[in-house]
Amino acid sequence: MPDRKGDRGRHQARKRAVDLLFEAEARGITAAEVAEARNALADNGADDIAPLNPYTVTVARGVTDHAAHIDDLISAHLQGWTLDRLPAVDRAVLRVAVWELLHAVDVPEPVAVDEAVELAKQLSTDDSPGFVNGVLGQVMLVTPQIRAAAAAVQASPDSGSATP
């Protein structure tokens, strides 16, 4: 039987990652910068700030590192919408979920989608869970090919940087 407390910990970490992405977008900085600042405050003894869950930091850095690809993939699967027109919370939820679909090999795809839908229920509009589910359902159709292509590039002897 799965460790339900661990599942809850990951859920909270995802929710916090969505919060960081939302804050970062509002402030015009990256989610990784927000995460680093939060952890620096916690490390310096700020009483009211706890260190972030390591998974939250991993997600924030991952979304920051792969932002252009994640946004392109989301945009390609929006029907009748543009990324800029989406509510900011929905953008953050989708970015976390797409990062998990592409890069979190220990997270089954249905779990990433279910978690995103649950976060949309908790944090966004009544229409958002169905919308998020629909977009991620389409993204899930192409993630195996994207993961395979990324693995092939990493395995290629030519994938390293050239040295002078």
From Swiss-Prot:
It holds the Pfam family NusB. GO terms for cellular component: cytosol. GO terms for molecular function: RNA binding. GO terms for biological process: DNA-templated transcription termination; transcription antitermination. Keywords: RNA-binding, Transcription, Transcription antitermination, Transcription regulation. Transmembrane segments: none annotated. HAMAP family: NusB (MF_00073). Belongs to the NusB family. Involved in transcription antitermination. Required for transcription of ribosomal RNA (rRNA) genes. Binds specifically to the boxA antiterminator sequence of the ribosomal RNA (rrn) operons. This is Transcription antitermination protein NusB.
